Amino acid sequence: MYPVALKKYFLSIMLALVSSGVSAEIFLFSSGNQFHGCLDCEESDQNSICNRYGKFGSLYQSSSIWNANGIGNVGRRDSPFSDMGIGLKMADTQGNFKGNLSISDKGDTEYSQLLKVIWGANQENYSDVRNDFCTLIEKLNNKKI
């Protein structure tokens, strides 16, 4: 694992790289159009993937991307953490497709690139990945106008 100082430096670089392409309220859906939370909602939002006490941010809820035995399982085709899968569909509030959230080559968004790097940097530890990813999301939310 990276030393803490290097990790913080790395995360600040990643934040700078993606802060220009951030949009508001991106929702995640599996291939069957099952809802899996809001990617960039405020942490306190009950639908936020960063609300660790909510249905979509908990390590223990099967609908949470952070659950290794649920939608986050690396063996699932629609898991964001599958090397070979398509990940979850991303859509805005109008239902417009915004790409896939995936660490695989199908992950064609800045969010996917962030997730892929954080996934590797945290040695695939779901709790640490959630914490780092959500820290960046919070910082990105604070930059919105």
Residue locations for each model-derived region?
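Repetitive, compositionally biased segments used for assembly/scaffolding
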Residues: 22-145
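Bacterial N-terminal signal peptides that target proteins for export
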Residues: 2-10
